[in-house]
Amino acid sequence: NIALDLFGQANGLLEYASKIDKKKSPDDFAFKRNEGDFYNLKISEQPNGHFGTTMLKLFFSSAYRYLLYEELSNSNDETISALSLKSIKEVKYHLKHSKSWIIRLGDGTKESNNKIQQSLNSLWEFTGEYFEEDSIDLEMKKNGIGLSKSLENKWKDIVIDTLNKAKIEVPKSTYMQTGSKQGLHTEYLGKILTEMQSIPRKY
């Protein structure tokens, strides 16, 4: 159900992008772009691994998307505002679901705690990209279309509170990945796109 919700949210945005572009269809954006033309955050292309890693990825992203859609519901762009309002209820459930599992795994057995801690250690360096701004973000902010303020502090409040309840520790390293908004990715995106785009590109 969560995957279907995310497909629906993505489809709404791709349909709007197609309407603005007037040349490319939603399928063109999804299946006919090359790796360097994708600007997704690197955390989304990391392998899901075990259940704890999957839930942690969902938790980080859901916390961000919930705050993002809440803010974008006030966008001057009526379509973005409407899509955001429609998505908030879904993402609120995703956040609640993933948060409960993070706490359950962290505050469970020694093995489950160790596994979720290892997942956190691996994924934490990808979380800084949520809050990077490029020239497009600044232009949208200026025109009242995009975010009017950073969501970083609110996101950290949600995340740190949950990690404390789960009895797992934020890594001490301050290194953060960057570059996805310039089309730079890890080796995993190419593999995902090869599988996802093979049939549409062939036919």
Predicted regions located by residue number:
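Extended, helix-rich structural scaffolds rather than catalytic motifs
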Residues: N114-Y203
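Domain-scale activation on soluble regions of proteins
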Residues: Y16, Y39-K42, L67-L72, T79, ...
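Internal, conserved structured core segments that host functional sites
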Residues: K42-H97
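Conserved alpha-helical segments that form or flank metal/cofactor-binding pockets of metalloenzymes
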Residues: I2-K32, K99-I103
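Amphipathic, non-membrane alpha-helical segments in soluble helical-bundle scaffolds
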Residues: A3, N48-F59, S81, N113, ...
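Acidic, low-complexity proline/glycine-rich segments
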Residues: K24-F38, I160-K165
